[in-house]
Amino acid sequence: PEYRRQRQMCIRDSHMPDEGDILIDGISTTFKTPRDAAVSGIGTVYQDLALQPLMSVTRNFFLGREISKSVFLDMNHMNEITRTEMAKLGIDVADPTQPIGTMSGGQRQTLAIARAIYFGAKVLILDEPTSALGQKQQLEVLRTVNQVREMNEIAIIFITHNDMHARLIGDRYTFLNRGRVLADGDRDEIDMDNLRALMAGGAELAELESEFQNTST
């Protein structure tokens, strides 16, 4: 997890990579702050979602980017935007003033994704978006991610340990082992057996299996 986190931080904020470049529209780019990354179109949905459970759906959608009308928040406008953007991803929010803690885990994930898209994400980093959810909620999130994928407007980095979810969503795969690239390839180059083996540890798993067999004999 630490290696994975460092790679994310190189992309989304001020961590400088030891080697290689981050290219945005073909231009080598570095970020001094997470805000710089966001302005350049890097949207991140964190594993903890960065949501405030006691605040409303709308306040979470606009957290830190509220729309003002004179000296007051323009809640009517923000409520309408929240409803519209959530509806685009298949979630009907009847009352955007309700605490976000009343929504399901899958709906909260969808809100975090919709928020990133609304505020201009060109690259969407999803950090284990299904890991803490039940099966039904996992399916909700996968449908949402697939909807975004089919827009063909946003690149998605989908970080997961679930081979089935990777197969459903991925067009191209990169397998990391302790911060190093173990393998990569397009969807048509990696079948399900190879996908499963690489995600399970590949050569290290085979070595462990051999060790167990030798121990048992």
State the predicted function of each range.
Residues 166-168:
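A short, surface-exposed alpha-helical micro-motif characterized by mixed small hydrophobic
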Residues 1-7, 11:
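Single conserved hydrophobic/aromatic residue that forms the stacking wall/gate
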Residues 20-29, 38-40:
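Conserved ABC transporter NBD signature motif
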Residues 117-122:
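A short, proline-enriched helix->beta-strand linker immediately N-terminal to the Walker B motif
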Residues 139-151:
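Helical segment within the ABC ATPase nucleotide-binding domain
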Residues 160-161:
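H-loop/switch region of ABC-family ATPase nucleotide-binding domains
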Residues 124-127:
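Catalytic Walker B motif of ABC-type/P-loop ATPase nucleotide-binding domains
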